[in-house]
Amino acid sequence: MSGLLTSASSSASKTLESAMGQSLTESANAQASKMKMDTQNSILDGKMDSASKSLNSGHNAAKAIQF
């Protein structure tokens, strides 16, 4: 009986260890993907901000021209 209990305990430990490892890997992959997406969004926000400033500057320059 003791050998059966030890075997079951060892099997359960291996199962939990595997599940924790998979969970940790999935979490790390998700965090890495989020970091990449946040960086890309930040870059795009900067480009959009620059484009908006450029358009506003052109619009303001056009308004300043007096005929």
Swiss-Prot record:
Predominant place of localization: secreted
Annotated region described as Disordered, given as residue ranges: 1-67
UniProt keyword Secreted present: yes
Compartment(s): Secreted; Fimbrium
A GO CC annotation given for this chain: extracellular region
Amino acid composition bias (Polar residues), ranges on this chain: 20-43
Comp. bias regions, Low complexity: 1-19
Protein origin, superkingdom: Bacteria
Keywords from the named record: Fimbrium, Secreted, Virulence
Function per UniProt: Major structure protein of the hrp pilus, which is a component of the type III secretion system (T3SS, Hrp secretion system) required for effector protein delivery, parasitism, and pathogenicity. The hrp pilus functions as a conduit for protein delivery into the host cell.
Family: Belongs to the HrpA type 2 family.
Name this protein carries in UniProt: Hrp pili protein HrpA
Source organism of the structure: Erwinia pyrifoliae
